[in-house]
């Protein structure tokens, strides 16, 4: 595909007028003000503005299914009375369709990549593979039991399996993070063990910090 004589906002904010942008194999293969040689297939000409895609740096994308479920509640009531009980009933199939819905909404608004933390992650991976978007995906991990270690949690086995099977998948569009849910839902020793797992695989960590006060509404 070739975009001809379009205006391009570049990643550094610079403006390129009457530009040509060539796409091959799903990637930008040419950017310049001279028409590139060769056959680029379909051509879209003029009166277009091309901008870099947006990156959504924190999502729980299957939670599109919970939109509007528990408005005007304090954070603790929203989580404990609505969200956690609802999530206990979710299936992998629910997570897959909720992910596809959220991904469709992101793509429609120009978001090309997102960073997600949830569970049934293999179904989120499936939705990402099928949709063409890019994503960092992590198995969200929390622990309220003072006697269980990280290795004893189901999330540990899930995280290792995700790292083994999905990191670098979909032609490199999918990366895997190690994802403690938040500092207030995960003990310090488990956070340390998760950091060690991330270091073992050379991947990033993704967590929630600076959470709103329990008194504030969501």
Language model: regions and residue ranges:
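N-terminal metal-binding scaffold of metallo-dependent hydrolase/deaminase domains
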Residues: 1-38, 49-50
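Divalent metal-coordination and catalytic microenvironments
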Residues: 6, 21, 26, 47, ...
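Short loop/helix-cap segments at secondary-structure boundaries that form the rim of catalytic
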Residues: 33-40, 126-130
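Hydrophobic "anchor" residues on beta-strands that sit immediately upstream
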Residues: 54, 112, 204
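Active-site gating loops and adjacent loop-to-helix segments of metal-dependent hydrolytic enzymes
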Residues: 65-97, 134-156, 213
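Divalent metal-binding segments
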Residues: 73-120, 183-190
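Metal-coordinating catalytic core of metallo-dependent amide/deamination hydrolases
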Residues: 124-215
């Amino acid at each position: 595909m070739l975009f001809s004589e379009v205006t391009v906002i570049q990643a550094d904010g610079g403006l390129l007028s009457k530009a040509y942008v060539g796409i091959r194999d799903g990637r930008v293969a040419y950017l310049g003000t001279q028409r590139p040689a060769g056959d680029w297939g379909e051509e879209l000409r003029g009166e277009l503005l091309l901008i870099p895609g947006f990156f959504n740096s924190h999502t729980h994308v299957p939670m599109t299914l919970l939109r509007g479920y528990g408005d005007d509640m304090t954070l603790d009531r929203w989580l404990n009375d609505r969200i956690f009980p609802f999530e206990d009933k979710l299936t992998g199939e629910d997570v897959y369709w909720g992910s596809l819905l959220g991904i469709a909404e992101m793509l429609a608004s120009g978001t090309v990549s997102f960073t997600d933390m949830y569970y049934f992650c293999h179904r989120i991976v499936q939705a990402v593979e099928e949709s063409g978007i890019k994503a960092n995906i992590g198995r969200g991990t929390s622990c309220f039991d003072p006697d269980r270690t990280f290795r004893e949690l189901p999330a540990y086995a899930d995280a290792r399996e995700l790292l083994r099977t999905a990191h670098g998948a979909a032609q490199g569009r999918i990366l895997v993070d190690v994802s403690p849910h938040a500092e207030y839902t995960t003990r310090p020793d488990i956070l340390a063990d998760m950091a060690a797992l991330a270091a073992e695989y050379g991947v990033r960590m993704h967590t929630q910090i600076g959470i709103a006060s329990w008194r504030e509404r969501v």
